[in-house]
Structure formats: C-alpha cells, structure tokens
C-alpha cells in the first residue's frame, strides 16, 4: 500500500474565501478552516500558500507601477492568511502565519527552520507575502515553499473544479476533462499550474494534484 504523504503544501485561491461578490464569506472561511484543522489532526503536516484574488488582482493594475501593484497583492495574502489562521484556531486547530514581508507585530518573519519546526509540531503553517518579491505569482511562491519545506506533495486548489479544455471562467464552451495525466496536459498545452511547471521544469508533476 502506498504511504500517504506526510508533509503537504497547499495553494489555495483567495477567491475561495469569498462568495456572492463578497471579499470574505464567514461560512466558507470556517468551512475551509475546519477542513484544514481536520487534515492536520490526521497527522499530516500542512503548509498553505493563499492568493489574494478576493482582494486584489494584477489585471486591475494596468495603469499602476508594477512593483506597487505586486506589493499590494502580497499584503492581500497577509490579510487572507491572518483570516485563515483565525478560522483554523476557531475550529480546534493550531496555526501560525509566517510572512516573507517583515511585520513582526502581526505575524512571524519567515524562516525555513522555524516553519519546518512549526509543521512538525502539527500546526497549520500559513505562508504569507508570496515569495517576498514582485513579479512572481503565488504559484511560484508555493513551489519555493514546497522545496524549502521538503514537501511530499503539492496541491493546487484552483477556482475551478478540475482540468478543462479552456478556462471555464472565460470560455462557456470549455469542457471538463475527468481524467488526464500531467504529461498529457502539458502536451495539450492546457493551463494547469503553469507557473509551477515553469519554475520546476516539470519536476513537480509527480507530486502535484489540481
């Protein structure tokens, strides 16, 4: 029997925290928090990178300085991570936020050894601030943190329910593909965690679930 992954890195869309046009939906937030708490209670070590799509997206910033726009997105991830830390703790779990942008009165400054230790203690570890640098997406950040945490598996929780022939948010004719290998997705040029593949040369494929 294949052994379950012990250390998991999850990329969670910020849009998952809001519904019906709201930035934050408390019922959804608590639901996600309970799921994360339950996963940690099984003994799995869980780290989470959250996007900021419910607060700020790069496509809103075409007329802004790109660095400023990216810094706004990074700060949005801090807000989302603080929100989810609270949700995990309200549902019986233990959590900590490490930020790549120093703000010690709000969350812990990111340190590889401290984050690994927190995961080994059974805390849900939230990685805020992206990679700490502009011009890199949170998909890139989760690959970086997965490598640093020596994760066994990388999960991408996108704002769609699977892999489609095209972006279902843009193309009403997009069709869900119920079963596809990562290699086939790449061959067909489907957009499945494309930043992950670009940053790892495809090495993430074996341990990547979307």
PLM segments and residue spans:
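Internal active-site segments that recognize and position negatively charged phosphoryl groups
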Residues: 113-165
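Short beta-strand segments
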Residues: 9-13, 50-51, 98, 127-129, ...
């Amino acid at each position: 029997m294949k052994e379950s992954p012990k250390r998991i890195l999850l990329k969670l869309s910020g849009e998952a925290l809001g519904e019906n046009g709201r930035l934050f939906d408390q019922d959804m937030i608590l639901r996600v928090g309970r799921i994360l708490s339950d996963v940690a209670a099984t003994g799995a070590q869980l780290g989470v990178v959250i996007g900021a799509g419910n607060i700020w997206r790069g496509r809103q910033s075409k007329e802004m300085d790109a660095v400023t726009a990216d810094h706004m997105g990074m700060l949005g991830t801090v807000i989302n991570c603080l929100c989810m830390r609270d949700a995990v703790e309200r549902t019986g779990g233990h959590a900590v936020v490490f930020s790549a942008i120093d703000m010690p009165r709000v969350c812990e400054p990111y340190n590889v050894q401290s984050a690994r230790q927190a995961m080994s203690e059974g805390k849900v570890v939230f990685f805020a601030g992206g990679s700490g640098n502009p011009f890199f997406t949170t998909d890139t950040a989760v690959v970086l943190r997965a490598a640093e945490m020596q994760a066994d598996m990388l999960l991408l929780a996108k704002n769609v329910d699977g892999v489609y022939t095209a972006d279902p948010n843009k193309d009403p004719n997009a069709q869900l593909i119920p079963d596809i290998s990562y290699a086939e997705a790449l061959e067909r040029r489907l957009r499945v965690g494309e930043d992950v593949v670009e940053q790892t040369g495809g090495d993430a494929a074996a341990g990547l679930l979307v």
